[in-house]
Amino acid sequence: MLRLTNIKLDLNHQPEALEQVVLERLNIAKQDLVEFTVFKRGYDARRKNNIILMYTLDVDTTKNKQLLSFFEKDQHIKQSPDTSYKFVAQAPEELKQRPVVIGMGPCGLFAGLLLAQMGFKPIVLERGKEVRERTKDTFGFWRKKILNTESNVQFGEGGAGTFSDGKLYSQVKDPKHYSRKVLNEFVEAGAPEEILFVSKPHIGTFKLVTMVEKMRAKIFELGGEVRFEQRVDDITIEDVDGNKRLSKLTLASGEVIETNYVAFAIGHSARDTFTL
């Protein structure tokens, strides 16, 4: 696979212009082009009367090796980097303990999803309600000033970002392309495919609710659990051979979960949990 960068086209170009520019840039016949995808699309608006689109394309041809050799000195034609996500582990066949994720905001949601995809069958605990019930409680506060302290704009499935405007960009460098995994999961859950390549991807609040539900369903399909209105009120830490080790979680309901593996994805507002 080849990566072509610095591809410039008019703002209102025709769809077929992309294929044509690939053929011209690589100097190949149409039958040698297998496929191409847009990896990134941005704007060059430095001249307001001549705004252009800037593309980065991933291209597969029948002559990849020959073309890489021929364009060896061209900085805008290189081999495409591997952007596939590499799981750090796979669960053993006999799982002695299930990991627990506390909180189901963005961090907890993806922690639960990735653990489930690796076969660890996680238990995700969320002190708030599932996203649609939580939406009712949140709008109840905004419109009627009725506050549910456990289900609001901060607590509940999806986290605080559920009621944001759904923008998906940051200033964080991502050399290993972890964000690609996130965006791919969003697309599988119903986000528009263009978030994979536009410079400032945006989903929108109303799509987020359905997407969060689909991602939760995926955790269940892979053997995990998601439990709502399950606040963690205490943790037990034991001394094992001179080392401190978490051993139990006690829920507000009184239930005790024995586990040595916990991801605290509690956001910035669960201050009662911070004090444990």
Segments (PLM) and residue ranges:
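Residues forming the flavin
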Residues: R3-I51, L57-L276
